[in-house]
Amino acid sequence: MKPNLRELSQLAGTDIADEAEQEAAALRLVEDGACEALVVSLGASGALLATAAGIERFTAPSVSVRSRTGAGDSMVAAITVSLARGNSLRDSVLFGIAAGSAATMTPGTELCRLSDTDRLFERVRLKSIVTA
């Protein structure tokens, strides 16, 4: 599942004010069996991955934003392709963040470019890990 922050708040049935509440809401959805892995897109702040093992936070590379249209779709598609290629969930999320960031660099409804995604992939960072 890949909600954005607003969608996570709706799924959790509560307002989410800070990182601790983001993590608690995401873990609760995993623990309640809604999904095995939850990737929450946080826009320019990156993303978080929640699994039964805990939370991993990732930073997104800084880019010049031309349009946000399609960023979430690009992120989901890149995660899916990466997993289908046999990459780890963590590496797939990193690739997804790169693709979502790359999509914001394109005008209008144009989706991400692979060359931009590959270049940005090297700039996505694992920020923190919190074990459950």
PLM feature segments, named:
Residues 1-24, 46:
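Conserved beta-alpha-beta core of the PfkB/ribokinase-like small-molecule kinase fold
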